[in-house]
Structures are given as C-alpha cells and as structure tokens.
Amino acid sequence: MNSSNPLVITLLGPTASGKTALALDIAERLDLPVFNVDSRQLYREMDIGTAKPTAEQQARIPHHLLDLRTPDQPITLQEFQAIATPCINAALEQRDVALLVGGSGLYLKALTSGLQPPAVAPQPQLRQQLTALGQQICHPLLQAADPKAAAKIAPADAVRTQRALEVLYGSGQPMSRQATAAPPPWRVLELGLNPANLRQRIQQRTEQLYRDGLVDETQRLSERYGADLPLLQTIGYSEALQMIGGSLTTTEAVRITSQRTRQFAKRQRTWFRRQHNPHWLPDQATLTDAMTLIEQHLR
C-alpha cells in the first residue's frame, strides 16, 4: 500500500479501558472528529448503559456514527459498513487522517479489512419467534448449525445469537462463512488499550452506571419498546430490568453486571489478540506514546 494513502487511526480495547478519554485527547491534539465503532452506541436513548460519550464530551469534540437509529430498528453489520465507510472517506478527503474508536472488534474489522457481511435484512417475525423460544434454546440451535459462529458469541448474548440465526435462515449460509473483499485504500494504525487494573476499572464503571441512572433509563426503554427488546437483554440493561421486576437487589445487579462485563472484556481481548495487531499502549504516558506513533505515521 502506498504511503500516500490516507491514515486511519483505530483505538481499540476492552470495555472500561479508557478509550473515550484517550480518544478525546488525541482528537483534540489533531483537531479531528471521533468516529464511533461501538455497536450499542449506534442507538438513540441508550446513553448510560452503553457509556456513550456525554453531551459535554460531544460538545468538546464532534462525534460521528452515534445515535443512528432507535433501539427497535436493528442495524446490521452490512448497514453499518454502508453508512460508516462513506462518512470516513469524506473525512479523509478533507484531512487525510481519521480516528475510529470502539470495542466492537467485528465492526472495526469490517471497516478496515474489507470484511463482507451477509446481505440479510432484519426479520422481525423471526426475531419474535426466537425471543419466544428463549436464549437457552437459541444458542444451542446456533451451536448445532454454525459452531464457529456460536463459539464467538456468549451464551447469554441474545442479540448476536439471533442475528447469526437470522443470517443462517435468511441466506442458507452460516455467519462464519463471511467473504472478504479487498480492504479500503487506507493505511491503518491500530492503537490498543489493555490496562493492568481493568478489573478495578470495570467495577468502578459498573457502579457509576447505576449511580448515573441506568435503572431509570432501562425503565424508559422498557415502557417505550417493551421489555422483550433484544438490546435490553444485553449487559447492564438485563440486570436493571431484573431490578425493576424485583428479582435482583441493587447490590446483586451491580455484582452480576460487573461479572458479565469482565467476561465480555475477556472475549474482547481474545478477539483483539487473534484478529488485530495493535500497538499496545503502556498504562503510563499513554497519550505521549500514542502521539509519538501517530506522528511517525503522519510523516
């Protein structure tokens, strides 16, 4: 790839690793907007539970690819790719450099590596049927039909399980057989965060989510879209729903959310290790090291 090609900086790492704070600092130094690559932050009204950049942070630095749809309008990976790629290319035409930030490894890979997701539109009727069956049945179904895809999806992750089954039934092809086309003509610099104190950071983040009003946000979403909304089965929202229903105390909800988040972070780390090759930034002087690497690639 020619060094004259535009530079795309991707900042990746597990949840609660400090991506947002570092992204804001990098964006400020380079006078760049931030492109979101977090799959749950694509949805409006889901702010606290997804740790979406606050209004103050978004006022400080422009953000793109946030709040694309309401939670009852699922965005497929292919749709995200079709929306995001032109936006990034438009920014590259202006500055020749762009900053992507997120913990959704598959979404990052789709953008930077030319991964071609299956062209299967959301199927509301099928999703209703799968929701009625329950995740205890759906995940084993996926394991039997597409074990490679199932191995990458947590048994409790109803959203991704349903999408994999949707692709399987809609196309006749397993999700794991996604094709790869030529990657875009970008130079990609991957910067990774993996702090040693991640467990502590996750616990602090979880407690903060509940203090900030996660339960109230979940209540509003449940009233507007129904408690069976697939996104309300994801980490944090699921436990908040159980609190609302009276089956969990606050202490229990925080503990379970923190535990599930740690498990999710472990899967993220595994994905980044297998699918990406980032420059892992140290826990100290992180911004300094990041800017040194970026400046080397901008020369």
UniProtKB/Swiss-Prot annotation:
Its EC number is 2.5.1.75. Signal peptide: none annotated. The keyword Coiled coil does not apply. The record marks S104 as: Interaction with substrate tRNA. The gene is miaA. Keywords: ATP-binding, Magnesium, Nucleotide-binding, Transferase, tRNA processing. PANTHER family: TRNA DIMETHYLALLYLTRANSFERASE. It catalyses: adenosine(37) in tRNA + dimethylallyl diphosphate = N(6)-dimethylallyladenosine(37) in tRNA + diphosphate. Its cofactor is Mg(2+). This is tRNA dimethylallyltransferase. Residues 38-41 are annotated as: Interaction with substrate tRNA. It comes from Synechococcus sp. (strain CC9605).
